[in-house]
Design a protein with these regions (language model features):
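Chalcogenol-based redox active-site neighborhoods
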Residues: 1-149
Length: 149
């Protein structure tokens, strides 16, 4: 399953503009999540953070992406002591590019929101994607894929 990854330029919590096509590492993990500092998103982000060094051994960069502001990302990143950057996409450019900004239903109400999704990218191609994932255990599943690719 190889398809061209959507290129983007987004500001990171380290203050650097990240452009996908300029990243030199072998793998990039982009995980999209609904909202900073919420229970499921905290579980998923903490799990990626705990496994960060194992991803790094495989020349893999991790980026968490949401529509939250850079200021929100910075506070949350500091709180969780993240070893990787979060990317702010307030204009929803990458969220729409990866088709994770979509209509959702909750308690009979419809609204637009981010579907928790992850993409592994190699040489500007998507080699694996997960959509509508459960937060618990997902980071380990992504690491298993990278380790065995």
């Amino acid at each position: 399953m190889k398809k061209k990854a959507f290129n983007f330029k987004l500001i990171s919590t380290s203050g650097v503009v990240i452009e996908l096509k300029k990243i030199k590492s072998k793998f990039v993990v982009l995980y999209f999540y609904p909202k900073d500092d919420t229970s499921g998103c905290t579980i998923e982000t903490n799990d990626f953070n705990k496994l960060y060094n194992k991803f790094k051994k495989h020349d893999c960069m991790i980026f968490g992406v949401s529509k939250d502001s850079l200021e929100s990302h910075k506070k949350w990143s500091k709180k969780l002591k993240l070893k990787f950057d979060l990317l702010s996409d307030e204009k929803k450019i990458s969220l729409k590019g990866y088709k994770v900004w979509t209509k959702k239903k909750f308690m009979g109400r419809e609204f637009m929101g981010t579907v928790r999704s992850t993409f592994v990218i190699e040489k500007k191609n998507i080699i694996k994607e997960w959509r509508n994932v459960k937060a618990i255990g997902h980071a380990k599943e992504v690491l298993n894929f990278v380790e065995n690719y």
